[in-house]
């Protein structure tokens, strides 16, 4: 829980997940720019899904998402492509590493509000280490395949969400829809349900990789379409 966490854990996660990405990008940027290469960062499904119990990790991956999106816009001017890989629950050493850090921290103070939960987590960590369970989850072959696509595909995506189960894909779509509806309700110029559907229909070919959007006439038509929505007067009503 965030209110019980020590800042050292946050610093550890940001050092690995955020500052590490920044340092490597800075170090290799000249070579990548010279060769017109590609940059692929490893984010996570937690870069846009947040929940109780992993807030610090999620915060670090949200930062990777923002860093990657901004870097992509900047490097585009230098003919360098940037993408993010967003794995779901695949086998890795993340959980094992976290367990080892928790058990090694013998000076950790008891939680004020969630001590029972902390003891349960520590017990599970001990059981896992005693049983010799190292990596849990689906083998990460699909993640490696996504990295290869981002590096070598002729028309790569800027984000590759890689999840082993349909339910994880459903979580991401549900979260995105929830955020769209929440954002739409925050201001006095919100759209009606029908208008939102029309906007989604307009964006659909672009999201599907329709290359007709590269056509100047099509782009002009789309600019006119969104300009019409941007300049409409008054608050929409059902």
Which residues are covered by each model-predicted region?
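Active-site helix of classical SDR
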Residues: 25, 60-63
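Residue(s) in the substrate-gating loop at a strand-loop-helix junction
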Residues: 44
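Hydrophobic positions on the long internal alpha-helix
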Residues: 24-28, 32, 41, 67-68
